[in-house]
Regions:
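Active-site loop/oxyanion-hole signature of alpha/beta-hydrolase fold enzymes
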Residues: 15, 21-57, 74, 102
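Conserved loop-alpha-helix segment in the C-terminal half of the alpha/beta-hydrolase fold
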Residues: 160-186, 190-193, 198, 205-206
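Gly/Ala-rich beta-loop-alpha elbow adjacent to hydrolase catalytic centers
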Residues: 60-65, 69
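Residue in the alpha/beta-hydrolase core beta-strand immediately N-terminal to the catalytic nucleophile
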Residues: 20, 58, 81-84
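Short beta-strand/loop motif that positions the catalytic acidic residue
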Residues: 150, 156-158
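Active-site nucleophile elbow and catalytic-triad environment of alpha/beta-hydrolase enzymes
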Residues: 128-146
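Short, surface-exposed "cap/lid" segments of acyl-processing enzymes
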Residues: 1-21
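Flexible "cap/lid" loop of the alpha/beta hydrolase fold
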Residues: 74-114, 137, 165-172
């Protein structure tokens, strides 16, 4: 989904790694009987950054991915200079995707996992590359033990007030928080697919001191 965004950023001289979270591989999960949870995904991204060369990272997460990058930042805030939530959940300690989302999405999760209780099937109309999502990652609460550095840039990129968005109230709250920068690309939730050029432009313009 982020291939076009990554390609534009590469052309502008940025190093980009688009991570496919465990269980969402294009050819299916490694072990369908053991769906990964939120901790699995936080561990995965943490390990990728640990293997890097130490250059400060701008860490981006879309939708559920906001849960993941918040968990990584709690562990590796000294390795990051930016957190970018792309129409994404922004958790506090003890929150989960389940607790932060709307009733309609909770119903969607349960209905989608009815077949096996493990994987949430892809709703009709989504990107054809989308894969069933592991239910445990939606319901596990995040554990955030520290306080993020005020020097860490925090950006929220809103897709606008699309029908059913669980992010409208969050967006307005962050607009009034001086620790955050808020951008709007009003094309709906799937910003990377619908307007990759605008998303790449916002990401490419982020500065290390933009807290």
């Amino acid at each position: 989904m982020f291939d076009s965004v990554a390609a534009e950023l590469h052309r502008d001289g940025h190093h980009v790694e688009a991570v496919t979270l465990s269980g969402l591989e294009s050819d299916g999960p490694v072990d369908v009987d053991r769906p990964p949870n939120l901790d699995t995904h936080i561990d995965q991204v943490t390990e990728i950054i640990d293997r890097g060369d130490g250059t400060p990272v701008a860490l981006c997460g879309h939708s559920y991915g906001g849960m993941v990058i918040a968990g990584v930042a709690d562990r590796l805030s000294d390795r990051l200079d930016q957190l970018v939530f792309i129409d994404a959940y922004v958790p506090d300690d003890g929150d989960s995707c389940w607790s932060l989302t709307s009733d309609s999405f909770r119903e969607l999760f349960i209905a989608g996992a009815r077949a096996d209780g493990r994987w949430v099937v892809v709703p009709e109309g989504l990107d054809p590359r989308a894969r069933p999502h592991p239910l445990p990652s939606f319901v596990q609460s995040i554990r955030i033990g520290g306080t993020l550095s005020r020097a860490l840039g925090r950006t929220f990129i809103s897709g606008g007030a699309w029908p059913g968005s669980p992010f409208v109230t969050l967006t307005e709250r962050l607009r009034n928080d001086s620790a955050w920068r808020v951008h709007e690309i009003p094309v709906g939730h799937n910003i990377a697919r619908r307007d990759p050029h605008s998303l790449a432009a916002v990401l490419g313009a982020l500065l290390p001191d933009s807290a």
